Amino acid sequence: AWMQAMEKHLPELKEYVSTSGSPMYYIAEVMKKEFPEYKTVFVGPCMAKRLEAERNPNVDYVLIFEELQAAFDAAQINPATLEADKFAVESSAQGRRFPISGGVAGAVQFVVGDKAEYKPMKIDGLTKDSCKLLKRFVTKAPEDANMVEVMCCEGGCIAGPGAVIPAKRGTVLVENYVKTSKDIEC
C-alpha cells in the first residue's frame, strides 16, 4: 500500500524509496521457480496486494483474510482444530515481525548491528500529517533518522482492512510466534 500511496501522492519521494520487493514478491518468485505448474495465492490482510499482484506475474491470486474466513465458514472448517504443518524452511524472528509496525526497521537494525550508525524512524499509519512530514524530507532530511519505515495501516500490516481479528490481538499472536523463531543468520 505504501508504494502505491507514494506513487500517487508523494512521487517526489520515489528516488529515496527502497526498490526492494515485498515479501509477497520474493516468495511468489521462489515458488514459481520451484513449482511452475502450480498457482500462487497470497493470503493476507491487505487490499493493496491485489494491485501489487497485477504487476507481478508470479502471483496468480490474492485472498484477504476475510475472504478466506468466509470460505472456511461456508465449508464448516475451523482452522484452530487442524494440526499444523511444519514448514520446510522456518522463517526468522526478524522476518516474522515484518507485519507489525517497527518490524522492518527492527530487522534492518538486527542485520546492521554496530556495523553502521542506524537511526530508524517509524511512520505508523499513513495520514495527512504523516504525508506532510514525509514531503518535508525531500528538502530537509530528518536529523534524527537515516531510515524511515512506513506502514500505511496504524499498527502495521497486521491491522489491514481484511484482518479478521483486532490489531492488538494479532500483534500479541505474532509476537508469541516470534518467540518460537530463530534469529536471522548474518
Q: What is each PLM-predicted segment?
A:
Residues 1-186:
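Iron-sulfur-associated redox domains of electron-transfer enzymes in respiratory
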